[in-house]
Amino acid sequence: MSDNNVMSDLEIAQRATMRPIGDIAAAAGINADAVELYGRYKAKIDPAKLIDPAGAPKRLPGKVVLVSAMSPTPAGEGKSTTTVGLADSLARAGRNVMIALREPSLGPVLGMKGGATGGGYSQVLPMEEINLHFTGDFHAITSANNALMALVDNHIFQGNELNIDPRRMTFKRVLDMNDRSLREVIIGLGGPAQGVPRQDGFDITVASEIMAVFCLATDIADLRARLGRITFGYTYDREPVTVADLGVQGALTMLLRDAIKPNLVQTIAGTPALVHGGPFANIAHGCNSLIATQTARRLADIVVTEAGFGADLGAEKFMDIKARVAGVAPSAVVLVATVRALKMHGGVAKDRLQEPNVEALAAGSANLRRHIRNVEKFGITPVVAVNKFATDTPEELDWLLEWCAGEGVQAAVADVWGRGGGGDGGDELAAKVLAALEAPHSFRHLYPLELSVEDKIRTIVQEMYGADGVDFSVPALKRLAEIEKNGWAGMPVCMAKTQYSFSDDATRLGAPKGFTVHVRDLIPKTGAGFIVALTGAVMTMPGLPKVPAALRMDVDDTGKPLGLF
C-alpha cells in the first residue's frame, strides 16, 4: 500500500474477487460451445459459434457509446477508467451492457503508462495478465508481420522472381516494445550467404498494418483478403507488390486464426468486457477490433467502447475509418475531461497541476471547447465526463460543470476510480448517457471518400485541428502521385500526429491558431484500407522515457507482479 494509505490500481485488482469466466460468459448470453477457456478468468469467443437462445426474439444490434477525451496530459485522462466505470454504472441501472476495449501494448506498460486496464475500482481483470502477455494476440500479430518480411527477404535472396526493389520497401519488422535503437537498421550483412543487404527498421507492433487489418476485418475470410491486399514494397519498375503476389496470405491468416477471436474478461463489478486488438491512435487508427465491437453489439443492448487519445485522433478515426467499414457509428459520445488537463492547457506547469487554480481552468477550456465542437461536426452532441481526481476542489468542479452548461452540453462528475466497481460514482454520468442515447442525432462523416487525398487531409487539419492549412514535403508530394497512379485515392486518411496538441508540435497546448500542419510522408495501407499521413516528428517506433515504469516493477517470492501501477 502506498504511503498515503491509498491502494494502487494493482493492489485493488489483486484484492478483487473474480468470477469464473464461464459464469461471466453464460450471464452475457454466450453459449458454451463458443467459449474457449484460457485459464480460469480469460476466454476467447468464437463469433462463428455464437447462437441465439432458443425461442428468443431477434434483437437489434446494441447501441454504441464512444468514449473519447480532450487533449491529454502524458499520464492520460482516464478514458479506460471512465469507460469501465460508465459500463458498470449502466449495468447497475439494470441495462444489458458490454465493454469493448483495446489490449495494452507492452512497450508503454514498461515505459510510461505502467498499465492500461482502467484504474481504481473501475478496472478490467485479471489486470496483470491483460497488461502483460494476455492470450498472446500481440505475439501472433508480431509473428505474422515478421514472417511476412522473412518471406519477402527470402524471395529476394532466392532469385527475386517478382523483381522486388529492396530500396523501395514500405513494410518493416515490428516488436511490441518501445526501442528507439531499432528505428533504422541494416540487415543482410555478413556476406552472400546472409541475404541481400538493405536498409530496414522496426515499428512497434501496434503500428503494424497487420494490427490495423486485424482490427478492421469483419471475419476470418475478410482478414485473409485484407492480408492479401497489403502492399509491402515496389518493383524496379515502381509497380506495387502485394502479399497476394507473394502468395503467403494463407500462411499469415493461419498464424492469426486463434488471435482473431475476441478475448472475454470482466470488470471488478462483473461486467463482461471484450478486450481485443490495440492500434495506437497517434500512429494508427486507435480502435479495438471490429469483430469484438460487432460481437458485443450482438450480445448487449449497449456497447461502451473507446478510441485512443483525444477526439481529434481516436474519435475522428472511429468515425471516418472504423464506422465506414461496418455500421458501428456511435449513438452517443462521451468526452472525458479532467481538471488537471485543463490546467495544463491553461499554462500551468506539470509540477503544479495539483494546486487549485480556477483561472487556469478558464484559460484551458478552449481545448475542451474545440473537442466539443469537433464531435458536433459528426452530428452528435457529446456528454462531458469530468473524471474526478483526489486533488480536484469543489470550486474547480463546480466551475467546470457550469462552463459545460454554458457551452450547451450535458456534463457530470465521474468518481469511478474511488466509487466504481458497482458503486454510485458513475450513476449521474450513466443517466446522462442514457438520455443521450434516446436523443435524436444524425451521424455523418467528416468528409466524403470522393475528395482527393490532399483535400481529405486539408479537411481534417482545418476542421478538427483548427489549422490554417497543410504543407506537403517533396517526398509526400511524390507519394501522392503514386497513390493517384495506383488507384488508392478513394481510401480514408489516418493522420499520424502528436496526441498532446491540436497542431503537429507537442508543445503548442490549448487551442492554438495560426499554424500549418506539415505532412512529411504518406503511406498507403492497402490492406487496412487507409492512407497514413505522417506529420511533425511523430514516430512509429517510440522510445522509452528516462525513468521507465519498468524500474518500479518486480515480482514477490510467489511470482506475484509488483509495481504495475
Swiss-Prot record:
Keywords: ATP-binding, Ligase, Nucleotide-binding, One-carbon metabolism. It is an enzyme of class 6 (ligase). InterPro entries: Formate_THF_ligase, Formate_THF_ligase_CS, P-loop_NTPase. Signal peptide: none annotated. ATP binds at residues 73-80. SUPFAM superfamilies: P-loop containing nucleoside triphosphate hydrolases. Pathway: One-carbon metabolism; tetrahydrofolate interconversion. It comes from the Bacteria. Pfam families: FTHFS (PF01268). GO terms for biological process: tetrahydrofolate interconversion. HAMAP family: FTHFS. NCBIfam families: PRK13505.1 (NF010030). Belongs to the formate--tetrahydrofolate ligase family. This is Formate--tetrahydrofolate ligase. It comes from Arthrobacter sp. (strain FB24). The lineage of its organism: Bacteria, Bacillati, Actinomycetota, Actinomycetes, Micrococcales.
